[in-house]
Amino acid sequence: MPSKQIRKQSVILTRGARKREEDSGTDVGEGADDWAQSKAAVRPPDQLELTDAELKEEFTRILTANNPHAPQNIVRYSFKERTYKLIGFVNQMAIHFSQVGNLIPKDSDEGRRQHYRDELVAGSQESVKVVTSDTEILEEEEEPKEGEGEGEGEAEGEAEAGSQTDVPAAAETTEKVIEEELMAPVQPKERKLTNQFNFSERASQTFNNPLRDRECQMEPPPRTNFSATANQWEIYDAYVDELEKLEKTKEKEKTKTPVAKKTEKMAMRKLTSMESQSDDITKVTQAAKIVERMVNQNTYDDVAQDFKYYEDAADEYRDQEGTLLPLWKFQNDKAKRLAVTALCWNPKYKDLFAVGHGSYDFMKQSRGMLLLYSMKNPSFPEYMFSSESGIMCLDMHMDHPYLVVVGYYDGNVAIYNLKKPHSQPCFRSTSKSGKHTDPVWQVKWQKDDMDHNLNFFSVSSDGRIVSWTLVKSELVHIDVIKLKDEGSTTEIPEGLQLHTVGCGTAFDFHKEIDYLFLVGTEEGKIYKCSKSYSSQFLDTYDAHNMAVDAVLWNPYHARVFISCSSDWTVKIWDHAIKTPMFIYDLNAAVGDVAWAPYSSTVFAAVTTDGKAHVFDLAVNKYEAICNQPVVAKKKNKITHVQFNPIHPIIIVGDDRGHITCLKLSPNLRKMPKEKKGQEVQKGPAVEIAKLDKLLNLVREVKTKT
């Protein structure tokens, strides 16, 4: 009974204690909640208050490899140049933590070798300890024990006799153990080999030792004054003396036969004669070139006088008419019966122009030629290059006038360097480098790219306009745009649609807006395109009913361009208006058109009937002020025309390979007349205003109609 009461009391006590703990816990918890609710955030008075939208706005963080703590203006002294130079490249590497480790994985070959070596070392140490402990025990047993009396009697004598018998046996065992240890072969330490298949390299940056100049004193070398003349005969005599010395040394040698000596002498004589001939030929060619120019100057002296000074006096009696005076005629027998397919003046040498020869008869394609003529020598070209395929177009670089880019009938493009004498192009496209699949109709040099690499564009009948860049002596191509006829599509039985590809024939880039250019096609349409957009055209003009032969921006007015076609028409456009401003019918297929460099209203066109037409909109807006046949035979077709950038002359080429130079009469190049007390205004602004005045009249008429 008493034990049961004790148990009941303990249970009651424990229940009461638990209840008190729960009550105390609830009180503390409630007090903690009240304290947490009454807590307020402390904010500074100038803190920004952002809205929910601003708080939810995400900001992107960009990680860069640049070290913000790296110095930007390090200047070091260059002992080589003896000046302080700014260090352009600064090391951007920042090391946060570096530790050299010496741990080796246990499973690797090196770890196993090291574990094996440690075991060998530990085993040898234990064996030495065992031997030393045995010897120490034996020595202790040999020493007499202290505290023993001297008078022990017979028992002591027997013990000593027994110990004396045991000592030699123990000594023999220790000596055997030591001999075995010494006679055992010592294993050499295994050399640590590097793992050729699992290793890491650690790079370190070392400081380049600066160059230092060290001076020392020495005796000056002896000096003598020497003077001699170096000319052709002195050099020849020196070579002859050297040759005689060689012959004397060969005569002393007895091993060689006299026949071998004679052959060597003949070979040496041939080499010296060939060298002298090559030097003489180069000098003769230069002298012959000078003499040829002198002879031509005397032969064509009357033509040169007309080119420089003659002015047609009959223009005073003709108000709105002019004439073309024939000057020189350029032709070459090697380019006979090859049509003139391209003309271009050199931007630096104004008397030099390039001619491309090919064939417009596509059923009878032949070779091509690139010729460069000078007005100083009309009888023979200055440079001559031949090609297997016909040349269809060319252009000369503005900054590098010795570089000529050409386009071939087979779709290739090539660059010729006039400084190099060989006849092959320096750079040429191939089928692997993205050449055109149809004839290349026009090429144009453009500004260099960001890396100062040469750059030019080409257009072809395959519908591609390609940008070519000369990178590391190689032509790299990029398709800028592909011409697609938006209106015409053909359906395939499978349900697919094929877009008709436009055939590009001509293009021209804007003089001020670098990315803007025009493209003419065989379908008669003109597309306004941009270098930045390769998928669509900026504008489309339904210009002609037949192929567009040429399209050119006006050299003065930024909004005006001209086009000509085989449909007998020449049209002048404002690129902001889809209808032409002026239309001229020339009663024959127009092969080419060109703006005059001296006026914004003058242009020339050539037709297949052998006539050249010169227009001046400021004089007559409706008709040409000069219609003149410039080829002898009616069957000859004029293909191209070009104005000289400085002189008042034009050059025209026909399909027989002839180039004719013509001088413009004063009525074809009229300038503003001087008025009393007023200065004549000149410059691009005057030319722009003159053309704007004509265009405004046409715009007013169109708005009224």
Swiss-Prot record:
Keywords: Cell projection, Cilium, Cytoplasm, Cytoskeleton, Dynein, Microtubule, Motor protein, Phosphoprotein, Repeat, WD repeat. The modification Phosphoserine is found at S124, S127. Transmembrane segments: none annotated. It is found in: Cytoplasm, Cytoskeleton, Cilium axoneme. Residues 136-159 have a biased composition (Acidic residues). Disulfide bonds: none annotated. WD repeats lie at residues 386-426, 435-478, 543-583, 585-625, 633-672. GO terms for cellular component: 9+2 motile cilium; centrosome; cilium; cytoplasm; extracellular region; glial cell projection; microtubule; outer dynein arm. Residues 1-44, 122-169 are annotated as: Disordered. GO terms for molecular function: dynein heavy chain binding; dynein light chain binding. Residues 124-135 have a biased composition (Polar residues). Its main location: cytoplasm. Coiled coil: none annotated. One of its GO terms (biological process) is determination of left/right symmetry. InterPro entries: Dynein_IC (IPR050687), WD40/YVTN_repeat-like_dom_sf (IPR015943), WD40_repeat_dom_sf (IPR036322), WD40_rpt (IPR001680). Part of the dynein complex of respiratory cilia. Consists of at least two heavy chains and a number of intermediate and light chains. Interacts with BICD2. Interacts with CFAP45 and CFAP52. Interacts with CFAP53. Belongs to the dynein intermediate chain family. This is Dynein axonemal intermediate chain 1. The gene is Dnai1.
